[in-house]
Swiss-Prot record:
Membrane spanning stretches: 14-34, 66-86, 96-116
This protein's name: NADH-quinone oxidoreductase subunit A
InterPro entries per the UniProt record, alphabetical: NAD(P)H_OxRDtase_bac/plastid, NADH_UbQ/plastoQ_OxRdtase_su3, NDAH_ubi_oxred_su3_sf
GO cellular component labels: NADH dehydrogenase complex; plasma membrane
Lineage, opening ranks: Bacteria, Pseudomonadati, Pseudomonadota, Gammaproteobacteria, Enterobacterales
Record PANTHER family: NADH-QUINONE OXIDOREDUCTASE SUBUNIT A, NADH-UBIQUINONE OXIDOREDUCTASE CHAIN 3
Function: NDH-1 shuttles electrons from NADH, via FMN and iron-sulfur (Fe-S) centers, to quinones in the respiratory chain. The immediate electron acceptor for the enzyme in this species is believed to be ubiquinone. Couples the redox reaction to proton translocation (for every two electrons transferred, four hydrogen ions are translocated across the cytoplasmic membrane), and thus conserves the redox energy in a proton gradient.
Organism of derivation: Yersinia enterocolitica serotype O:8 / biotype 1B (strain NCTC 13174 / 8081)
Subcellular localization(s) per the UniProt record: Cell inner membrane
GO molecular function: NADH dehydrogenase (ubiquinone) activity; NADH:ubiquinone reductase (non-electrogenic) activity; quinone binding
HAMAP family linked to this entry: NDH1_NuoA
Length: 150
């Protein structure tokens, strides 16, 4: 069991680093606050457009597909981190770790197959996997009253 003095003696460098980093950030923020200019005009809240008057709204509507791509990136990035951690400790984990990683990869592949099957990865609506029954022209032509039946 280590005493408080031993813990402090062991971690003093990290404490100094942490205090220095927080102090430096605070010093930069205070310096910017005191040395920065103050705009008191009406144009203070208008974005700077390189000397050109801004036209229209700055808000832009993005397609939900971009959000899906961002979520997929985060999901697969976290999965890559797990696999990297496993690959670093492959000797310590042995066959049990290999089996766990294989199951993890199979679950990921099942999720990817599911995303492909529901069409979540399709960018165009024409390529979606939904089956829509298209009415045939012959069916409508035969039911039209002006077209004679054979």
């Amino acid at each position: 069991m280590s005493t408080t003095t031993e813990v402090i003696a062991h971690h003093w460098a990290f404490a100094v680093f942490l205090i220095g980093a927080i102090g430096l950030c605070g010093l930069m923020l205070l310096g910017a606050f005191f040395l920065g200019g103050r705009a008191r005009a009406r144009a203070k809240n208008v974005p700077y457009e390189s000397g050109i008057d801004s036209v229209g709204s700055a808000r832009m509507r993005l397609s939900a597909k971009f959000y899906l791509v961002a979520m997929f990136f985060v999901i697969f990035d976290v999965e890559a981190l797990y696999l990297y951690a496993w690959s670093i400790s492959i000797r310590e984990s042995g066959w049990i770790g290999f089996i766990e990683a294989t199951i993890f990869i199979l679950v990921l592949l099942a999720g990817l197959v599911y995303l492909v099957r529901i069409g979540a990865l399709d960018w165009t609506p024409g390529r979606s996997n939904r089956r829509v029954s298209k009415p045939s022209i012959v069916k409508y032509a035969s039911s039209h009253p002006d077209i004679p039946k054979n």
